[in-house]
Amino acid sequence: MKSVFTLSASLAISLMLCCTAQANDHKILGVIAMPRNETNDLALKLPVCRIVKRIQLSADHGDLQLSGASVYFKAARSASQSLNIPSEIKEGQTTDWININSDNDNKRCVSKITFSGHTVNSSDMATLKIIGDD
């Protein structure tokens, strides 16, 4: 009887942990090394097309300056959207959530995100981390 109770308790705890893990759907989509010179062709290609409703940007190493960003959706006509992003992100700073307006039912998936920008105030390359929320 004691083993049945222990087994039941273990299953209940693992179900709670499972559901807790699924409540937070934030995923690191990737990291981009930002060059020291202004570049407009920095791309994060997602190997698996993901439905992403919003993103956060984080400067993990070094300060960076951004001049633009676009999201490309997997669609027959290669739809894209320009994003309203902050022009500067300091090391250790994370932006607020940036909404991605996919179609009305949020079923379009993101195939790539492009950035224009560069590292500032450093001889090392800054790194830009992209976090997605689906």
UniProtKB/Swiss-Prot annotation:
Transmembrane segments: none annotated. The keyword Signal applies. Residues 1-23 form the signal peptide. InterPro entries: UPF0412_YaaI (IPR020240). The keyword Transmembrane helix does not apply. Pfam families: DUF2541 (PF10807). Keywords: Signal. HAMAP family: UPF0412. Belongs to the UPF0412 family. This is UPF0412 protein YaaI. It comes from Escherichia coli O17:K52:H18 (strain UMN026 / ExPEC). The lineage of its organism: Bacteria, Pseudomonadati, Pseudomonadota, Gammaproteobacteria, Enterobacterales. The gene is yaaI.
